[in-house]
């Protein structure tokens, strides 16, 4: 879903690597 995808992008940008919302929902 788009909301989860948005979280994924935000987390990935923060960590500079792929981070999935179900692994790091808090970023």
From Swiss-Prot:
One GO CC term on file: extracellular region
A GO molecular-function descriptor: toxin activity
EC number in record: 3.1.1.4
Organism ancestry: Eukaryota, Metazoa, Chordata, Craniata, Vertebrata
Species annotation: Acanthophis antarcticus (Common death adder)
Tissue note: Expressed by the venom gland.
Sequence similarity: Belongs to the phospholipase A2 family. Group I subfamily.
Localization annotation: Secreted
Protein name as catalogued: Phospholipase A2 P-elapitoxin-Aa1a alpha chain
Main subcellular location of this protein, as a coarse class: secreted
InterPro entries the record matches: PLipase_A2_dom_sf
Required co-factors: Ca(2+)
Catalytic activity: a 1,2-diacyl-sn-glycero-3-phosphocholine + H2O = a 1-acyl-sn-glycero-3-phosphocholine + a fatty acid + H(+)
Summary of subunit composition and partner proteins: Heterotrimer of alpha, beta and gamma chains, each related to PLA2.
Keywords: Calcium, Disulfide bond, Hydrolase, Lipid degradation, Lipid metabolism, Metal-binding, Neurotoxin, Presynaptic neurotoxin, Secreted, Toxin
Function description: Heterotrimer: presynaptic neurotoxin. Inhibits nerve-evoked twitch contractions but not responses to cholinergic agonists acetylcholine and carbachol and to depolarizing agonist KCl. Causes a fade in tetanic contractions. Displays a triphasic mode of action with depression, enhancement and blockade of neurotransmission. Does not display myotoxic activity such as changes in baseline muscle tension or inhibition of directly stimulated muscle twitches. All subunits are necessary for maximum toxicity.
Entry superkingdom: Eukaryota
